[in-house]
C-alpha cells in the first residue's frame, strides 16, 4: 500500500488525526513522533500526563512533551499509528509551510516509521506501508 505523498520537496504524507485530514512529515532522524501542540483544538485532542525529563529541539532549546490522551486517533491510509507525544513544533511547521505551502500537524518519527514499516523511495517520490492491521 502507498501513502499519499503531498509534495516532492519533502516526505510529507496525508494523515488523519481524530477524523480530521491533515499532513505529517516523515522524519527518519526523529527519535519521537510528535503531534503539534498548537493544533490541539483544531484537531480535537487533549494532552495527557507530562513526559519525564525534557527533549532538546532542533534549535538546542529544551521543551516539555506530553502524552496524548486515550482518545487520540492517528491514521495513515486508514491504518492506526501509535507512540505519539505532544510538543511545540511551530518553528518546523513554519519552515515547511514556507518551503512547500503545506501545513503539517505532526512529525512521524522513527518509532512510528518502524511500526508502520514505512519505506521511503526518493527516486519515485513514493512512501510504501508494509504494516497490515
Regions found by a protein language model. Give the residues of each.
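Pepsin/retropepsin-fold aspartyl endopeptidases
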Residues: 1-133
Amino acid at each position: 500500500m502507498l501513502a499519499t505523498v503531498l509534495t516532492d520537496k519533502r516526505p510529507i504524507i496525508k494523515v488523519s488525526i481524530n477524523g480530521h485530514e491533515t499532513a505529517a512529515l516523515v522524519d527518519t532522524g526523529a527519535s519521537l513522533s510528535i503531534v503539534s501542540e498548537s493544533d490541539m483544538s483544531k484537531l480535537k485532542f487533549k494532552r495527557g500526563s507530562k513526559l519525564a525529563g525534557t527533549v532538546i529541539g532542533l534549535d538546542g532549546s529544551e521543551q516539555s512533551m506530553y502524552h496524548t490522551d486515550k482518545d487520540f486517533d492517528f491514521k495513515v491510509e486508514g491504518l492506526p499509528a501509535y507512540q505519539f507525544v505532544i510538543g511545540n513544533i511551530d518553528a518546523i511547521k513554519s519552515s515547511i509551510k514556507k518551503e512547500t505551502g503545506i501545513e503539517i500537524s505532526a512529525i512521524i518519527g522513527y518509532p512510528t516509521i518502524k511500526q508502520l514499516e514505512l519505506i521511503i523511495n526518493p527516486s519515485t517520490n513514493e512512501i510504501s506501508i508494509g504494516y497490515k492491521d
